[in-house]
């Protein structure tokens, strides 16, 4: 077995080197963006490191805000400035509206039948419309206030118990579980935590993001696809798909058995109703339902949890900001112990804190890649159809040319005089993307994050447990991968205010 692997490696390397030198003989006349030096066969894949957004930001600092890399033989355009992002997501948005679908993304999205990876077109518009109408609209967000209050109240009770016993809590885990339970009620009709056959949201989300990340060699070099079997990444992807598929199958079966008895249909009920309607504009089969539910449930859970976790991290690192926020919340919300969604609308410093957290810690620092559908001229360079485009929101939102010399610092006050919001109108601030592919779940996520943070800050004072030794700022260390969750959980001591 080992000999066969060695022979395969040698043959593959020999053939790819031949192809590499053959490509050197070609002298294209195209005017291409600057590129760093790359290796044969793998191109620039080796330069991504454990934190691709940071690695690409460093490369862009040397080669410019519009940079062309090769992932294997696949051309990938890296955008690291607001000016170029404007051209991609507004001026030429339609040409850049498609998605590249890697092997892992194809499997997880049922061949692009979800919302994130679906090709731009009628099906994508229909899915986006039904998700917005039945889950993500302002009307639906407001109607889920009671469900949010129930779960946030349970979290407050858990923290109160810890306060009385002077115990520490893993706030990262508590927040993830709470958001998962809220989304369970909103998307699935009930929370499934504690039931047999449920999933570990944080673990499966991390595995999902790793599976559709940038690093798998086989995704970009088909001749080396067999490496996934040896490293186990193919098996991990199969396990993720089956695990979540089985869970959603259980959810669908429960809904098929009980839909007729419900007074208020949930999101899954609405999808099943649409599926049964042969005259519906959007025809969906069960596999389509599974990937749409997967996306709405996990997507909202992971992004919202990360925002709250980073917000608490930053506030405890900056006690003067925490004090300002506590004063505002306790001044606006005096009558009730619970801070409602209506009350947070009048909290300007809270809004600034959320904006600053999303500036420093966008949920996906590298926006979901786009695919160019036809040739285009971009900043004087010739970009050919089939080129993938990655926009480094993390780099754009820490650009000192835009944000000043303190761009790396947490300073909510910088947002007081700005009219910037989350919906991509200003390309210097794009935590959820912009243009046609703007994330449609902004309203739901921002309300959950704001209300949860307001209640955490109002009800308790906080002391953070010392992090592991060996790190300069352990609480700010990012985990590996394409998301930016904390490497270490946020362990804190709450005390009733």
UniProtKB/Swiss-Prot annotation:
The chain crosses the membrane at residues 1-21. Keywords: Heme, Iron, Membrane, Metal-binding, Monooxygenase, Oxidoreductase, Transmembrane, Transmembrane helix. Its EC number is 1.14.-.-. Heme binds at residue 439. It is an enzyme of class 1 (oxidoreductase). GO terms for biological process: triterpenoid metabolic process. The keyword ATP-binding does not apply. GO terms for molecular function: heme binding; iron ion binding; monooxygenase activity; oxidoreductase activity, acting on paired donors, with incorporation or reduction of molecular oxygen. PROSITE patterns: CYTOCHROME_P450. It is found in: Membrane. Possesses triterpene oxidizing activity. Catalyzes the C23 hydroxylation of marneral to form 23-hydroxymarneral. Catalyzes the C23 hydroxylation of marnerol to form 23-hydroxymarnerol. Belongs to the cytochrome P450 family. This is Cytochrome P450 71A16. It comes from Arabidopsis thaliana (Mouse-ear cress). The gene is CYP71A16.
